[in-house]
A protein has these predicted regions:
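Short beta-strand scaffold segments in enzyme catalytic cores
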Residues: 4-9
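Active-site beta-strand-loop-beta-strand hairpin of nuclease catalytic cores
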Residues: 11-15
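Cysteine protease-like catalytic core of ubiquitin/ubiquitin-like
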Residues: 29-34
Length: 141
């Protein structure tokens, strides 16, 4: 049986809802989402403060949607999902070079949504999210 999940990408009032049919658990979809976001950071430039906090939201979304067999845009939650991932960002625009620059506010993983049985957890950084994935990986060994 597949482990289905939804992903919400929030930036202000804009929400993008994605669906993933298989491997929705932390060491599957969670790790993939972590990797795609970490590979969507802004290039390091001397005038940026805290560069690791800023990401290119367009690049992140594009990485997910290019995976034709993994993610699709949806207009409603899946009926039997076990994981709901919510990536919340705030705008990081300063000038024209920053049109898609955002700062990560939080990543929430809801395993209680519909059919999940694992509770809700909120992470304030990508490294906290990776720690949770690593913990889940160890528990499954």
């Amino acid at each position: 049986m597949s482990t289905r999940s939804n992903i919400i990408i929030k930036n202000g009032k804009t929400n993008i809802l994605l669906y993933r049919h298989c491997d929705g658990y932390l060491v599957g979809a969670g790790q993939d989402l972590h990797n795609d976001l970490s590979n969507s950071d802004f290039e390091q430039e001397p005038y940026f403060d805290n560069i690791a906090e800023y990401f290119n939201i367009a690049k992140f979304t594009e990485k997910l949607l290019k995976q034709d067999t993994d993610y699709r845009i949806d207009n409603q939650f899946g009926g039997d999902i076990e994981y709901l991932y919510t990536f919340e960002f705030e705008d990081g625009y300063e000038h024209e070079d920053h049109y898609n620059r955002v700062k990560l506010k939080s990543i929430e993983v809801d395993q209680e949504h519909e059919y999940g049985r694992g509770g809700k957890n909120k992470y304030k950084s990508l490294s906290e999210f990776q720690d949770a994935i690593n913990k889940a990986r160890k528990e499954n060994e």
